[in-house]
Amino acid sequence: RHGSRIMRPVMARMARWDRETADRADRYVAISHYVAGRIGRYYNREASAVYPPVNTEFFRPDQTAPEGFALVVSALVPYKRIEVAIDACAQAKVPLKIAGDGPERATLERHAAGRAEFLGRLSDDAIRTLYRRAAVVLLPGEEDFGIVPLEAQACGRPVVALGRGGARETVR
């Protein structure tokens, strides 16, 4: 309770600073229409959407046949909702490989209880190989943009994503 008494004026001052700073911008550029919409709602300003690029010379299909596993490529943090992919793959009896690392790794490994293979942080070459071998790439969390679906699709692999956020713009 003491913290809220102290934090309330600090948060009010930060909100004022945020508004004043936002009002000084000449133009807003967002990484997706989803983020541009948030800018419009919060700041009552228009924003252009410019998608981050994907290196389609590097991420491209080859002759690799899919191997029947699902793939998650992600930082292992709570908002990515990796546990949803673990549970869904376990229920569907589809092997799951998880590439990435982060503070939630130990928690997710306990949750998975052997139902997923954790690969850790990998090189871009290793990620590309995994995309090409995966039957499907999963994006279970809400992302402002999400580069993973574009890389996977550039490698010729289907993506199943949460139907919110930037994925609605990029998953075809």
Regions found by a protein language model. Give the residues of each.
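Acidic anion/phosphate-binding donor-loop and adjacent secondary structure
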Residues: G37, R41, V54-G68
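Nucleotide-activated donor-binding/catalytic signature segment of Leloir-type glycosyltransferases, i.e.
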Residues: A106-D125
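Short acidic/histidine- and often glycine-rich active-site loop of Leloir-type glycosyltransferases
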Residues: E151, R164-R172
